[in-house]
Amino acid sequence: MGELFRSEEMTLAQLFLQSEAAYCCVSELGELGKVQFRDLNPDVNVFQRKFVNEVRRCEEMDRKLRFVEKEIRKANIPIMDTGENPEVPFPRDMIDLEANFEKIENELKEINTNQEALKRNFLELTELKFILRKTQQFFDEMADPDLLEESSSLLEPSEMGRGTPLRLGFVAGVINRERIPTFERMLWRVCRGNVFLRQAEIENPLEDPVTGDYVHKSVFIIFFQGDQLKNRVKKICEGFRASLYPCPETPQERKEMASGVNTRIDDLQMVLNQTEDHRQRVLQAAAKNIRVWFIKVRKMKAIYHTLNLCNIDVTQKCLIAEVWCPVTDLDSIQFALRRGTEHSGSTVPSILNRMQTNQTPPTYNKTNKFTYGFQNIVDAYGIGTYREINPAPYTIITFPFLFAVMFGDFGHGILMTLFAVWMVLRESRILSQKNENEMFSTVFSGRYIILLMGVFSMYTGLIYNDCFSKSLNIFGSSWSVRPMFTYNWTEETLRGNPVLQLNPALPGVFGGPYPFGIDPIWNIATNKLTFLNSFKMKMSVILGIIHMLFGVSLSLFNHIYFKKPLNIYFGFIPEIIFMTSLFGYLVILIFYKWTAYDAHTSENAPSLLIHFINMFLFSYPESGYSMLYSGQKGIQCFLVVVALLCVPWMLLFKPLVLRRQYLRRKHLGTLNFGGIRVGNGPTEEDAEIIQHDQLSTHSEDADEPSEDEVFDFGDTMVHQAIHTIEYCLGCISNTASYLRLWALSLAHAQLSEVLWTMVIHIGLSVKSLAGGLVLFFFFTAFATLTVAILLIMEGLSAFLHALRLHWVEFQNKFYSGTGFKFLPFSFEHIREGKFEE
């Protein structure tokens, strides 16, 4: 089979890179993205590797760039992204980059510090301006006799009796508006009502110099008598984080201070504007290049991380690396190494040497933007074992088709297809926007899956003749009512029977099968569900058994490729016979009944369920039991016996043959050391047995070929028993599992019909002049519920059930999924802006 149906052939290669050329060679390999480096220093601490200092320098540059990016985003300056892929800087360029980033960071920090100090000063002056303005209003109000009478409680009765002049102290300040009620209660309780508080709101919010948020504040002035109350008031103000400001006692002094404050505010505003302009210029200049800087720094960091995976030659002049790479890309890798050597100016070429190993290579399946989503569906279950059959090419068709069987509705399929087509046509623009919405990104990555699901849903919707729960009368119904009146229907028959059944046996009633799909007359029939359930149930069984048989057939190609004849003789053959003897025969019975009994003889059609149950019970009653065909009893008994014989065939033969092979090897005293045979030479049959065992052994961790392990017949027998039981019971449970195709299709059709009947049908029934307006609102509700329930919820449900059918019922027949993914060293994720390591 071609590479499309299997993972790429991989090889382990050793790279010898000259120290001065290693950086450029790894850079070229990163641009190519076809090699996966192995860590040759697993026992060496990360902080003790050779290039750890360079990695730290790159991380420090990355930190500075993140700081600059944060400031750019805070200033709402758009970051320019031209899609440019800059070349990796040379190691000597790191000093210039560090100096440039250091300069920008220090300049921004200095600007921010100065700006924060200026804003703090500006805030204080602004608060003082409002204090002077509001306190003047307070003092003007103090001349009011009513207010003076209100504040008279601040004086002791003895002082009032002696006529002591009123000498009140006061403090003025600003506090957050939401703290005023609590602040007022605290003053009243602590000072026992011996203070007088006046407060007024500042109309405009003030900017916090630290956070940049706008805060609503209020001006307050507190009158008191005595130093003790003064200390209490100041402590309370300090606890509530109120800002206190000096306020002159005379109106003239307050007026002069206000004039000076306004002048200073104007001067400070001018300086702040100039500072902000300078900051904007610095950030705008950085915004033009920051994406390029990010890519350069992170490419350098990735290169040094990769170089830390290499071994250093004892001469300190050569780096040794081991990489996994596809065999088909060896030439391009060699070319990349030559290009890297030329860029570095080295005269000694880098060497790539293929290595022989018994380690299991990583699994690498080439994909494009169309197959990427389907490959992800397979990989979500498990990464395929190296070189085993890849289910993704078949999933491209089977997955959307099984989804459509459950989702089949022509109208809903059109909506889904239109949405997918919109994403496909605008994919370039959407990719360039780099949408960070995770849910939309997930849906967009599966746009081609959704496209095929929509197209197949349109196809199955036409088969079901279902469009928003209504049938399409394209070719005209094949059923006619007129012949029924010709034979036995009368006016009295119509009046006395609310439900009448057409007799297809009468000439002219049934004109033959509908040209395509289901006859639209069934949409208004009262026994519609009975007919559709029978059809969809049988269809689900047929599709399920064909799907599983296809999966078992694919296992044959795996056994042939891995040269495992025992798995063919004692695995594939009995498995395929077991399934076809029982469930393949059931499919044949379904098709036979469809062809043997037409509309005229349907009354005599026997029940397949009864026949299939009696087949296992060997029960064939003499009376009241009609055979489907002659010789049915003998054929069915033979098939059941064959299926039963397949169970010990799968269970016993393979362990016994493996035990016999082990005893023969042990008797011959033959060992194999790297291909050199010692002892009595085995026969040709024994050589094939040894080869089969070696090819069946895959070790991911062992660096050297392992010796023949001791054969444990008990473990082998238990493992084979588990596999046999799982397969035999799985054939039954998996076949039943495919009935979800029928169940989900029924649920979708019923929900669609309920929506039409309970929503849009009511809107269409309004006959008044306001019917158009009513229909508008009902249609809006119908469209919303259709998208939310039938397209999204039901679509997601059908999607998950299709996943289950592929992962469990299909892939477990041939797909082990125990491999590990090929993760090449590549700069692609850096170019796309995905910087997470």
Swiss-Prot record:
The modification Phosphothreonine is found at T250, T360. Glycans are attached at N488. Residues 1-388, 427-441, 555-572, 659-724, 810-837 are cytoplasmic. Its main location: membrane. It holds the Pfam family V_ATPase_I. GO terms for biological process: endosomal lumen acidification; lysosomal lumen acidification; proton transmembrane transport; regulation of macroautophagy; synaptic vesicle lumen acidification; vacuolar acidification. It is a multi-pass membrane protein. The modification Phosphotyrosine is found at Y364. It is found in: Cytoplasmic vesicle, Clathrin-coated vesicle membrane; Cytoplasmic vesicle, Secretory vesicle, Synaptic vesicle membrane; Melanosome. One of its GO terms (molecular function) is proton-transporting ATPase activity, rotational mechanism. Changing S477P: In DEE104; uncertain significance. The chain crosses the membrane at residues 389-407, 410-426, 442-471, 535-554, 573-593, 639-658, 725-749, 771-809. InterPro entries: V-ATPase_116kDa_su, V-type_ATPase_116kDa_su_euka. GO terms for cellular component: clathrin-coated vesicle membrane; cytosol; endosome membrane; extracellular exosome; ficolin-1-rich granule membrane; Golgi apparatus; intracellular membrane-bounded organelle; lysosomal membrane. Residues 408-409, 472-534, 594-638, 750-770 are vacuolar. Keywords: Cytoplasmic vesicle, Disease variant, Epilepsy, Glycoprotein, Hydrogen ion transport, Intellectual disability, Ion transport, Membrane, Phosphoprotein, Synapse, Transmembrane, Transmembrane helix, Transport. It is linked to Developmental and epileptic encephalopathy 104: A form of epileptic encephalopathy, a heterogeneous group of early-onset epilepsies characterized by refractory seizures, neurodevelopmental impairment, and poor prognosis. Development is normal prior to seizure onset, after which cognitive and motor delays become apparent. DEE104 is an autosomal dominant form characterized by onset of developmental delay and drug-resistant focal and generalized tonic-clonic seizures in the first few months of life. Neurodevelopmental disorder with epilepsy and brain atrophy: An autosomal recessive disorder characterized by global developmental delay, early-onset progressive myoclonus epilepsy and ataxia. Brain imaging shows progressive atrophy. Belongs to the V-ATPase 116 kDa subunit family. V-ATPase is a heteromultimeric enzyme made up of two complexes: the ATP-hydrolytic V1 complex and the proton translocation V0 complex. The V1 complex consists of three catalytic AB heterodimers that form a heterohexamer, three peripheral stalks each consisting of EG heterodimers, one central rotor including subunits D and F, and the regulatory subunits C and H. The proton translocation complex V0 consists of the proton transport subunit a, a ring of proteolipid subunits c9c'', rotary subunit d, subunits e and f, and the accessory subunits ATP6AP1/Ac45 and ATP6AP2/PRR. Interacts with SPAAR. Subunit of the V0 complex of vacuolar(H+)-ATPase (V-ATPase), a multisubunit enzyme composed of a peripheral complex (V1) that hydrolyzes ATP and a membrane integral complex (V0) that transports protons across cellular membranes. V-ATPase is responsible for the acidification of various organelles, such as lysosomes, endosomes, the trans-Golgi network, and secretory granules, including synaptic vesicles. In certain cell types, can be exported to the plasma membrane, where it is involved in the acidification of the extracellular environment. This is V-type proton ATPase 116 kDa subunit a 1. It comes from Homo sapiens (Human). The gene is ATP6V0A1.
